Every structure is written in structure tokens, then in C-alpha cells.
Amino acid sequence: MIVGLIIALIVYAALVFYIGWSGYRGFGVKNKVFLIAYSIILGLLSISFILGRVVGGSTILTIIGNYWLAFFSLSLMILPVVQLIMLILRFTRLDRNKTRVTATILTLVILLSVLGYGSYLAYTPTVNSYSIKINKEYKQDLNVVMFSDMHFGYLSGAKHAERLVQEVNALKPDLIIIPGDIIDDDLDIVQEKDIFSILSGLEAPLGVYGSLGNHDRYRGNMDELITAIESSNMDILYDEGMIVDEGIVLIGRKDHSEGVRMETSELTAQFDEQLPIILLDHQPYQYAEAEAAGVDLVVSGHTHYGQIMPGNLITGALFENDWGYLQKGALHTIVSSGYGFWGPPIRIGSQSEIVQIHIDFDN
């Protein structure tokens, strides 16, 4: 593990040097003071994300570190393209130095513009709607609102939570379900920002229910974390289920990352299979098992739909359904791209979302 960490740090340092050297050469400023200042700033930026995660407790460091991570990732995608264009332009009569400086400035403008637009997509959720039919009886159609991956913490804070409550309540849901990653690893900062008090404003006649994800962690035991989250009037289903309104079965699984958890069939066996069954499972795995266990609808998150492209190509390869709706036999599956974000508050090729699900029954 130590060897792997050392190799990762060496590779990271080499990539930072590549970005830094490209920028330094591009600006064409041959000045010792500029070089020293440039190197110090680049060095501090390059360790800001690591320090923010390891040290913690600093909002400014966390913000800088996460935006640096986005800048770093986008630079690695854009710089090779720019340098290929510059190589081709060498065979023209254009002034090489002027072309290099112009290209560097344009690259920086493009990077900052993409970061700005990506931040807008991260903080401006859209509402995506689906209509499904479950061939079981229930007394009425349901308007269900689902959202996941809020990652409440330093960057997904009180204002983001307030907007969530406002937009969800405007949809007038009968039922609200939240399949995990409610917080971003740090319960203390969420409590400091009074997020759970804000979430208590969510309104649905049949209640608000959630399961936990891989980022819903706490230094204490899980009971303490669940108690804290449930102070928002949300019921957490932790490898357990319940009957809502005498006619709908809701089941929440432990996250896949916990390793040991009950099988879906063990959870559904506790209920009448004639009742509609909705499963909250943070990571979109084991659809065949869910269908065999009599589940009618699985809602998940986790993938963020890649968050920053081409990450969506990776999630598409890893998950059978990495975003949106997929039907497998009688099983309906819906995966959200998430309301929040992990790491940089940036989305490129995806957008933060709230999901509205209209369910029609044999009523």
C-alpha cells in the first residue's frame, strides 16, 4: 500500500510539473521573481486538496483544494490538444512566441469559463421526470420525489439545502425517498451548518425516507449518525424495511461498500409479495437479485453520471444503469446523477438533479 501511495504521489507530482511547465513556457515571462512566485503558488495549490482532506476543518482550504482538483483534471484534458495544435502551427509563418502566448491566454480563459459553467451546473439542479406502471394494487397513483448524493458539507451547504427543500416541496410529493450519500464524510460540519434542521422542512404526506451511502460515515458508531440524520424527520432504513400507508413496502439496504449486508431476498421475505416494493440501494448493483426477490422499483445514486466528462464513459462501463431509467423484466430501475457533488463543485456533461417519479398501479 505504501509503495502504491508513493507511486501515485510521484505520478501526481509529474502531472503537476507538466501543467506548471506548460503554463510557464506559455506565458513566456523569463523573470526569476516570477518563476519563484509562480512555483510557490503552483506548489501550494497542488497540495491544497490533499491538506483539505487530511487536515480538515478549513473551509477556505477545502474550497481552494476542490477547485484546484477541477482545474487540474480539465488541464490534463485540454493541454495535450492545445499543444498538438501548436505543433501543427509550427509549420506556418505565424510568429512562434506570439502564437504561444496567445494560445496560453486562450487556454486559461477556456479553463476558467468551463469551471464557471461547471459550477453553475453543479449548483443549479434540474428536475427529471419518469412515469412507470407497477402491476400490483395500491389505492392511488403516487407522486414520488427522489434525490441522492447531496454530499452536504463544506461546499454543499445550507443554501444548497434550502434550495432543495424549496424545489422538492414545489413538486408536492406524496412520498420522498433518498438513496444515500446524504453527507460528505464529516457529520460535524453538517451539524454546524444546521443542515438537518433545514431538511426537516421537507413535506410529504407519506413521509421522508432514506438509506445510507458510502460517504455517510462518522467517527462514532452508525447509530449516532442515523440518530443525527433522523433529527431532520427523515426515517433511515438501514438493512430494514417498513410498510407505508398500509400498502407500500419501502426497503433500504446498507451500502455495497460495507461488505456485510442482508440479501435483498432476505429483506423482501419479511413482507407480503403482493404489495408494491420499492428498494433504496445507494449503488446500482444486483438488479437480477432484486427482480428475483420481487422488488418493483430500485432507486439509486452514487454514479454522479461521471460528474465531469469523460467520467460518464467510466460509469457507463462499470454500471448496468449509470443514469436514468432502465427496465429489466418487471423491475424498474432509476439512477440519479445526484443533487450534490463529490470533490470540486463542478459538473461537465452532467447536471445536479431532482427526480420525480409518477407511479401508476392496478387500482
Report the location of each language-model feature:
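Soluble catalytic domains of enzymes that build or remodel membrane lipids, polysaccharides, and related
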Residues: 133-363
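N-terminal signal-anchor transmembrane helix
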Residues: 61-62, 89-110, 115-147, 153-166, ...
